[in-house]
């Protein structure tokens, strides 16, 4: 009986299954080592949804903490909208990750009596200073971090702070202006500042930061994550199935690789669905095709807005969407799609475009020109392509 899946959809990949990204890891470590020389380093890790940003950050944190003796912490900022909450979560994460270390007593005074145990049996902790003290931390953030680096000198080489899921509060100018002021203060007042910040966000978040504070982007070393190549995808699937003593037929492996399209989000969703569908120790193409349909349904339910999900799956427009979904493409020209439609589908195509626009699934692509549309969320064409691919294979 199967006890666990080696695949982790929606979560960072386990370190033992991490593949590819060698050049990016080398680049990140180069900046990390520069921070140990007393220089503030700022990296913006950019990539589309499901491309593996958090996995790469988690790998970096593990090696810098365990192998390079950094004080490292990974701060998840979903739902954060204020600078007070941002700074509170940073210090709370430092406390949670390191309060059981011997050296932590050197900085424990900074947390005072503002740490509370919560939950059953006090298994979780929160850092909750009064709002006025949080405001002071926001205003004196560089000094607070510098004091920590001074206290742990000799025990830790530098601070490594990952700010993950920054999409929410970057829509306002507050963060961009505050972070620019933070970096400027360090440049002028701190000769030594061994701190390495990694911000993680979508490409459009970089654009938003630039609009709010045009000079901010020159501060960051931008690292962009691209899709994995086929060899890396194959390596990942082999590692994952080997870990649970399962084999995979060559044609099944080829199909999984093709439909994963180099995207970790698809690799994990397809892999997990295939794993649970298989009843024998060898994965066949039959398992894979069943897994693709399951994975498409999972992605639709997990990542798409319910109204969008229902609209995309409606029989009225499904045939059109399947023709759009013959390839993963973020944009399309309406005449290219019209040429693929039969007479009945062509009659409703205008209504289709109007309805998809009303739901916020597509918008007119002004930059491309007249007749061009693009998907608002890059997961939409992924889902449509995957569902379309599964439908075709089911018909065979």
List where the protein language model places each region.
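P-loop NTPase nucleotide-binding core
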Residues: 39-175, 195, 347
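A short, basic N-terminal segment
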Residues: 1-43, 63-66, 188, 380, ...
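Conserved small helical "lid"/interfacial subdomain of P-loop NTPases
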Residues: 225-252, 258-259, 270
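Short amphipathic alpha-helical interaction segments
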Residues: 341-360
């Amino acid at each position: 009986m199967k006890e666990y899946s080696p695949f982790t959809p929606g979560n960072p990949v386990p370190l033992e299954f991490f593949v590819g990204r060698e050049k990016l890891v080398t680049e990140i470590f180069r900046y990390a080592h520069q921070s140990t020389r007393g220089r503030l380093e700022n990296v913006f890790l950019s990539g589309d949804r499901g491309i593996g940003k958090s996995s790469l950050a988690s790998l970096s944190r593990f090696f810098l903490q365990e192998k390079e003796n950094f004080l490292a912490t990974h701060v998840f900022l979903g739902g954060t909208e204020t600078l007070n909450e941002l700074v509170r979560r940073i210090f709370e994460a430092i406390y949670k990750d390191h309060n059981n270390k011997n050296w932590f007593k050197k900085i424990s005074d900074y947390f005072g009596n503002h740490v509370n145990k919560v939950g059953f049996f006090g298994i979780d902790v929160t850092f909750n200073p009064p709002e006025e003290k949080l405001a002071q931390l926001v205003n004196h953030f560089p000094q607070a971090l510098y004091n920590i680096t001074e206290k742990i000198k000799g025990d830790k080489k530098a601070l490594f702070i990952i700010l993950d899921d920054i999409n929410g509060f970057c829509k306002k100018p507050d963060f961009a202006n505050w972070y620019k002021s933070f970096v400027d203060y360090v440049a002028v007042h701190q000769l030594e500042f061994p701190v390495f910040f990694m911000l993680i966000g979508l490409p459009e978040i970089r654009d938003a930061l630039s609009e709010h504070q045009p000079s901010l982007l020159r501060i960051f070393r931008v690292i962009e994550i691209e899709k994995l190549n086929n060899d890396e995808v194959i390596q990942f699937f082999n590692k994952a199935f080997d870990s649970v003593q399962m084999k995979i037929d060559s044609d099944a492996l080829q199909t999984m690789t093709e439909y994963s399209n180099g995207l970790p989000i698809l690799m994990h969703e397809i892999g997990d669905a295939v794993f649970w569908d298989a009843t024998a120790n060898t994965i066949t193409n039959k398992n894979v095709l069943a897994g693709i349909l399951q994975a498409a349904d999972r992605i639709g339910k997990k990542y798409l807005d319910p109204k969008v999900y229902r609209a995309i799956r409606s029989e009225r427009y499904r045939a059109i969407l399947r023709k759009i979904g013959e390839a993963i493409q973020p944009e399309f020209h309406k005449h290219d799609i019209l040429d693929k439609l039969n007479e009945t589908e062509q009659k409703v195509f205008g209504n289709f475009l109007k309805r998809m626009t009303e739901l916020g699934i597509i918008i007119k692509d002004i930059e491309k020109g007249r007749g061009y549309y693009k998907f608002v969320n890059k997961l939409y064409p992924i889902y449509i392509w995957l569902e379309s691919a599964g439908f075709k294979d089911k018909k065979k």
